[in-house]
Amino acid sequence: LTDGVFDSSWSLFRDRLTWLRETLTEIKKINNSNWLIKPHPNDEVNRVITSTVSEVDKICRNCNHIQLFPNDIAIGSVPKFIDAAVTIQGSAGTEYPCFGIPTFITAETTISGLGYTIEPQSKEDYFSQLQNIKKIKKLNNQQIELAKIYFFIYYKLMDIPVNLIAYMESSIIDEKRFWTLMTKLLNKYDFREDLLIKMMKIQAKNNDMH
């Protein structure tokens, strides 16, 4: 609910909480399909006022066809037993299409318009497609190939080092060490050698989305 909140220029929903609540309310009525709800790890890290777990409990209590994702199941096994995925703009839209799994996105993402995600144009369209989710077919070979190509580009080729920012895992930040490294980088920084700046100039010149 708190990850990448301001990343999109458009969304079918006002915010992530609205998307979650309205989606849960809709799938509550779609009991011919089983729904697994996976909370985002940031819910616990950021100690949010309301969470995915509490919203599911409040809206979908006693709905046997809606369950929280079990903690004892490896995330890597998910593609083996799901038929579709739904996200507002999360990494599911990048990952699951690589396995041929049709995936809904309801806000702008870096994969918007690439041809392998389901992108409803309105809330009504979104809810209608959820109601008919059993009729949605697996992705074809061309779509799967496109998804894999993008995945490789995004996670491998786009990983450009930034000469001015010290690398540190966001989950274990040592602020004193971070600022010490930042000071050292700043003292020897030369923007003419910065690969990121060179790449951004090319992107701006070509008016590229990525």
Predicted regions and their residues:
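Short acidic-hydrophobic, aromatic-tinged amphipathic segments that line or gate anion-handling sites
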Residues: 66-70, 117-129
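Conserved catalytic-core segment of nucleotide-activated headgroup transferases in glycan assembly
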Residues: 1-57
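A donor-sugar binding/catalytic signature common to diverse glycosyltransferases
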Residues: 71-118
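Nucleotide-activated donor-binding/catalytic signature segment of Leloir-type glycosyltransferases, i.e.
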Residues: 53-69
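Flexible loop/turn segments at secondary-structure boundaries
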Residues: 1-6, 42-47, 75-78, 93-95, ...
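Generic, well-ordered alpha-helical scaffold segments in large soluble proteins
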Residues: 22, 26-30, 59, 81, ...
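C-terminal amphipathic helix plus adjacent low-complexity
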Residues: 124-210
